[in-house]
Amino acid sequence: MEHTAHIFPIIIKGSPPVMSSNPRRQYRLNLRSIKCLKEPRVRVWQAQWPLEPALSAAKMPRAAHAHAPHAFEIQASVPAGLQGSGYFAPSVRSDLRLPRSFLFLNKK
């Protein structure tokens, strides 16, 4: 099966990330793999999460961030047309704390 790179918007359900005090920083996540419903061997090679300071855990009220979804863009090598939901096996260099479950959509 031929794999091509796609950029997926991924909606994270859970707590917001723990951010550094530098608001200009773009977080790079090193995620080893995505495991999803249709294709268990999707490989992730880069992820970025540009965040505004207002979204940081320190500035968001505790009641609000318990339910707020957070989005980031991820680049993965996956089969074309793949859609679904799943979880990632994180290898995160971490000032980020991410939940394991997510939803991803491949929209062209």
From Swiss-Prot:
This is Uncharacterized protein YOR343C. It comes from Saccharomyces cerevisiae (strain ATCC 204508 / S288c).
